[in-house]
């Protein structure tokens, strides 16, 4: 349910460039690639990232770009992104991700304290660069880890 909801909230158009923070098993990256999107996905846990990259390639989603690294910092070389989906809870919306979101883009991110109830937040960046945030529903995600 949550993968479908978060994907739908991005309102992705075919060919859109999307960043996923928190590759995990690679499931959401595969869903995004299946929709015809240009997918960049980053995972901080090396073993998970390497396994997901191999799995995506083996299943025919080799066009999804994968990287092991700290998702808080996003993927500057791939920016700007039409959409960003974050699958780990952050204490706040990371400024590097806001900077990498294209004007007119949307970000879906759980925000709140680790191991507590968080809020799923939709961040919309207007054409002039102003931000609008909307809390959507309570969720519980693993914490966004890394050095930030």
Language-model features: locations:
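A short, highly charged, low-complexity intrinsically disordered segment
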Residues: 36, 147-148
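Conserved nucleotide-cofactor-binding alpha/beta core module
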Residues: 11-131
């Amino acid at each position: 349910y949550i993968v479908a909801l978060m994907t739908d909230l991005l309102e992705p158009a075919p060919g859109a460039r999307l960043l996923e923070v928190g590759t995990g098993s690679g499931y959401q990256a595969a869903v995004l690639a299946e929709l015809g999107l240009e997918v960049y996905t980053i995972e901080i846990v090396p073993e998970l990232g390497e396994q997901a990259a191999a799995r995506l390639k083996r299943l025919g989603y080799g066009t999804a770009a994968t990287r092991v690294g700290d998702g808080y910092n996003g993927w500057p070389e791939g920016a700007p992104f039409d959409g960003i989906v974050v699958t780990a809870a952050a204490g706040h919306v990371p400024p590097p991700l806001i900077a990498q979101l294209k004007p007119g883009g949307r970000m879906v991110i759980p925000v709140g304290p680790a191991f507590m109830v968080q809020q799923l937040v939709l961040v919309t960046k207007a054409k002039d660069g102003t931000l609008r945030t909307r809390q959507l529903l309570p969720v519980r995600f693993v914490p966004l880890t890394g050095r930030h």
